[in-house]
Amino acid sequence: MGQIVGSMHMNVAEVFSNRRKRKRSTDSSLGKDDPAQLDTTQPKKKKLLTTTQYIYKALFKEEKNSDVAVMALDKVWHLHKVYLSQSPYFYTMFNGTWREAQQNFIQITILDDRITVASLDAVFGSMYSDEIEIESADVISVLATATLFHLDGIIDKCAEVMVDNISPETAIQYYEAACQYGVVGVKKSTFQWFQINLLSIYSKQPNLLRHISIELMSALTASPDLYVMQTEFSLYTLLRTWMFLRLHPDYDPEDPVQRAEALKTQELLVNAGVETHAPSGDVVQWTYFTSRSEERSFLATPEGQPYVKVFQKLRTQYLTNHYMDLKIIYNDNIIPKEWLYRHIHNHWDALLRIDHGQEDCSPQQLDDEQFFENCMRCGRMLLEPGYQKWRWTGFNFGMDLILIMDSRRLNIRRHHRHEHERVLSLQTKRKFMVRTTVTSINAQRQAVFTQTSEICSLSLEKNEEVPLMVLDPKLVHPLLISINMLVVMPPNQSFKEIVPLSEEATTSLSIPISEIGANSDRPLSPSSADDSAVFIGDSEPSTPSSPAPRPRIAWSASETGAICGQLAC
């Protein structure tokens, strides 16, 4: 009996074993012959909608179980009070004594033109989701909407998008929006961007330049951190163009027809013997300012009054450093002549004091505020590394200062040659104050890294060279260099607080600017602001010597004849 049971147990085991072998064999052959059938037998993993996605789809998009309708800009959203209450705006409305707390239909009057239906939809939808998609083109609208509903999280996200996308096309709008909605970080970032790029970018893009507000331009002009490329006269020409563009909002400086007319007008003026000292593209603004019959400055006219505070912030004491610059400014007659005469008097007084060795003329014991309010601002761009040497030309109280970039070190040298002793200071030592700032920028011309020195007082002997800064390894080209310098004690400039309405008496007692330095021979004198920095030695310029002429509108040929008549062509 035991043998029978044992035999049956073995037979049953063999049967099941054979079945398992056949099944494995069948499965194996099936996998080889038809993989698709094998796949159908395996379990599939399906990702279900997350709770957030379901809420967004069912409650916001499909508007299920809505308990309140919100109407704005002629569109109605069927929403839910519990989600809207994430906004302090709606929370106060639904939980206070407002009549809307008991209503299921709310109409919101939108007074801000920046708010759109799309931005409202995006902000409402964000209350049902844990994310919001913000495009740089729509960020201001979303910011305006988030500000209306006091949604700080979305405001912060908008600020991040704006800071990352500052460019010549967006900077003005971003700055104005930041001021309007109180986004301090964006306002600071855009202002810093303007300080770096105002003269480098907007001098070549007039249709963008014209949209800079008077308030912003005034703040930039006053800033000691403004990168003035090349000298203060460069900033003056930019302000002249900016003011002209704002006074003529309908004129398109990039219109090809108007540019061609400008060239014809320039040729007629040249043939008539009229010196414009301006590119053909600038002949329109040149004619507008120089052909006025009034003796008073343009700033004294009703049209010029709104711009007075901007030109008061201009360091006009550094506009009289070069004969050609002075002649152009005098002919423009934008700035009151009284300002120019006072500066010339102060320069001459300081030069006499320096020549007689008066120590009270050298800048000393000045606090930072005094230095920053009165210092000269000069700038330069270095596109590539290498040995480079340059000077900013113009009258500098008998000092010929040369900047030298050698490898990773920026030096300054008091250049003195015996053949130039008639025009250079003979004092053994000259004292001055200086601050150096170097910035590395990216493709969007945003500051990547900035290195700034302290304000230091230097005392240089003839031909002495000292280092200004050893560059940090994080500074990579292209580099922007800004020098703040004070060579003499700043004089009192309270006279700039007054813009004389009539300058006839002052003019009759003054020497014409056209006669100042008429016999001077200065081969290094720049013909314009773009030539204010002169390279020395064998080094190659790191930036073009002059930018492309800015296009301008022109008068017709018949009007040109009238212009020549007014100018005694």
From Swiss-Prot:
CDD domains documented for this protein: BACK_GCL (cd18495), BTB_POZ_GCL (cd18305)
Residue ranges of every copy of the BTB domain listed in the record: 66-136
Any one Gene Ontology cellular component term annotated for this protein: nuclear pore
Molecular function GO labels: ubiquitin-like ligase-substrate adaptor activity
Pfam families documented for this protein: BTB (PF00651)
Region of interest (Disordered), ranges: 17-43, 517-553
Keywords assigned: Cytoplasm, Developmental protein
GO biological process terms on file: germ cell development; negative regulation of DNA-templated transcription; negative regulation of torso signaling pathway; negative regulation of transcription by RNA polymerase III; pole cell fate determination; pole cell formation; proteasome-mediated ubiquitin-dependent protein catabolic process; protein polyubiquitination
Highest rank taxon of the organism: Eukaryota
SUPFAM superfamilies: POZ domain (SSF54695)
Primary localization: cytoplasm
Cited PANTHER family: BTB DOMAIN-CONTAINING PROTEIN (PTHR23231:SF17), GERM CELL-LESS PROTEIN (PTHR23231)
Name this polypeptide is given: Protein germ cell-less
Source organism per UniProt: Drosophila melanogaster
